[in-house]
């Protein structure tokens, strides 16, 4: 349920204005990559969250194999079922704690930099659209369409609103592939997005800035007057 997140009509507002707006790109390794109107940037890592999920899946897989060799309803099968429930409960509590820290750190950074509005890519709706292979491949859907991703978005929106920060969710299609300098579409490889026109930028912050551009201008394009810093870009790295 995403009732606390508002969707606004498309606007074309200046990239830089009296408001400091931040674009946020969500990811599996870096939960939130942020880039604002004043060219401040930060990355809030979600590595621990991914590690928790991997450990949970490994443990559940081992139990499932043992249960397959047991008779359903037997004492052994029931013991394994209880162990499975304990793993799920423990993992859920650990995830909730990490999600709180990740979203709290992100909102604290927004407050520190005077952010008045968050524009974030709508990966949850994309992940639900399982027939649209062009927008998100199956592997990425499995990574992003999960409980943790939805909770991250919920918690971020809740904390933002409690601090008086507006939040807008937009279609994030092409924000990772589009070069804002020449408009070329290129699938990023490695940690740096590189285009044949000479544009280079940190891959995750490239996506966040394109979300900011798309949400404020209605198109992914930078102007010479933007005074955009060149790669390597300076950013804060926050380990939750």
Language-model segments: which ranges?
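Positively charged, helix-rich recognition surfaces that bind polyanionic ligands
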Residues: 1-240
């Amino acid at each position: 349920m995403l009732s606390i997140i508002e969707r606004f009509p498309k606007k074309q507002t200046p990239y830089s204005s009296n408001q400091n707006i931040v674009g946020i790109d969500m990811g599996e390794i870096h939960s939130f990559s942020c880039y604002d109107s004043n060219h401040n940037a930060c990355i809030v890592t979600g590595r621990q969250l991914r590690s928790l999920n991997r450990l949970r899946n490994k443990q559940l897989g081992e139990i499932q194999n043992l249960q397959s060799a047991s008779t359903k309803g037997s004492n052994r099968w029931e013991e394994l079922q209880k162990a499975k429930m304990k793993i799920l409960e423990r993992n859920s509590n650990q995830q909730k704690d990490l999600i709180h820290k990740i979203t709290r750190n992100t909102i604290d950074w927004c407050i520190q930099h005077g952010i008045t509005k968050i524009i974030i890519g709508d990966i949850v709706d994309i992940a639900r659209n399982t027939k649209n292979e062009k927008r998100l491949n199956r592997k990425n859907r499995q990574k992003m369409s999960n409980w943790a991703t939805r909770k991250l978005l919920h918690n971020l929106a809740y904390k933002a609103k409690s601090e008086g920060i507006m939040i807008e969710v937009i279609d994030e299609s092409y924000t990772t592939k589009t070069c804002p300098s020449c408009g070329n579409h290129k699938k990023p490889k490695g940690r740096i997005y590189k285009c044949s026109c000479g544009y280079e930028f940190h891959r995750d912050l490239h996506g966040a800035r394109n979300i900011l551009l798309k949400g404020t201008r209605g198109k992914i394009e930078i102007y010479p007057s933007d005074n955009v810093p060149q790669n390597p870009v300076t950013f804060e790295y926050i380990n939750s």
